[in-house]
Amino acid sequence: PLYSSAASDVYKRQINAFSNANTVVSLANGNLGPSLVKELFKSGEILSLSNDLVKPFYKGRAHQALNWFREALVGVPYRIHQPEGAIFLWLWFEGLPITSQELYERLKRRGVLVVPGHNFFVGMDSEWRHQRECIRISYAQDSESVKKGIALVGEEVRRAFREE
């Protein structure tokens, strides 16, 4: 065999230890970031930065992503929620012949990460098809990566409908 079960146990312990350390580091933020922005909050300048820089930037990115989706999804039944300030879009592919989980798996193999919709319908009727026809996609990465990812989403969704 390529590795023994003893080695496998060592790897499992190492992975578990790394996972635990990552959880602690991710959940316990340091003091540097908060201390740097403390004055921005006290002075109210954080609001002008948000309204004058951050909000317009992501509004432009949202509109660009919407345009790329319009190009990538021609002929595909889809709807996109109205973006209202978040850094992601919700897409609904009505009648998608595969689940959003399968779409996620296909896209992941091609280097594109989306979030399958069913993860956001906790406690809902599991028979409701809509939850398996939606994905959430972020447009916060660099424009070229987002554009490429959107094109690949279009290819995979079109493929799913073709294979139906």
Q: Residues of each region from the PLM?
A:
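Conserved glycine-rich beta-strand-loop-beta hairpin in the small C-terminal domain of fold type I
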Residues: 52-66, 78-93, 130
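Short hydrophobic/aromatic beta-strand micro-patches
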Residues: 8-9, 90-92, 138-140
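Short, conserved charged micro-motifs
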Residues: 97-103, 144-148
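Structural signature of PLP-dependent enzymes
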Residues: 17-25, 43-67, 96
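Helix-loop "lid/cap" segments that line or gate small-molecule binding pockets
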Residues: 9, 35-45
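PLP-dependent enzyme catalytic core of the Aspartate aminotransferase-like
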Residues: 109-110, 124-164
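Single conserved hydrophobic/aromatic residue that forms the stacking wall/gate
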Residues: 1-7, 11
